[in-house]
Amino acid sequence: MPEAPERHVFVYGTLRRGGRNDINRLSPAPDYVGMGEVRGVLYHLDWYPGLALGGEEAVTVVGEVYRISAELEAILDGIEQIVPGADSEYFKREVEIAVQGRPVTCLLYEINPVHVRERRPMGHGDWIVFHHG
C-alpha cells in the first residue's frame, strides 16, 4: 500500500506550543519542523485568534510548522470546526510558509471573512506574545 503524502500544518494561535489547544498534546503526535512566517492580518476573536491572509494591514504572522498524519489532520479539522460551505468559521487552505528561509506547503486554517467584518486587526503578528503580554 502506498504511503500517504507528507502533510504539514502552520499553527499560529491556540494550537501553538503552550497554547490552550497545544498541538503537541494531541495524538497521534506531530513532528515539529520549525518556526514559520506568512503575511496576513490577525484578529483577536475572544480567547483565540483568526488569521486573514494578505490584505492592506498585513504583518508578518509567526507560527509553528508541524508534519502531521491524515488522522491528526482530521482531529485539527474538528477543533477548527471545518464544515462544508460558506458558514464555516475557518477555511482550510494550502499555502506556502517560509520556514527558515525555505518554502514549505502547509495547511493553514484561515478565518472566514464574515467573522471579522466588524473586528479591528491586532496590529501584531504573534498571538502568543499578544495573548500573554
Question: Which residue ranges define each predicted feature?
Answer:
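Glycine-aromatic micro-motifs
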Residues: 1-133
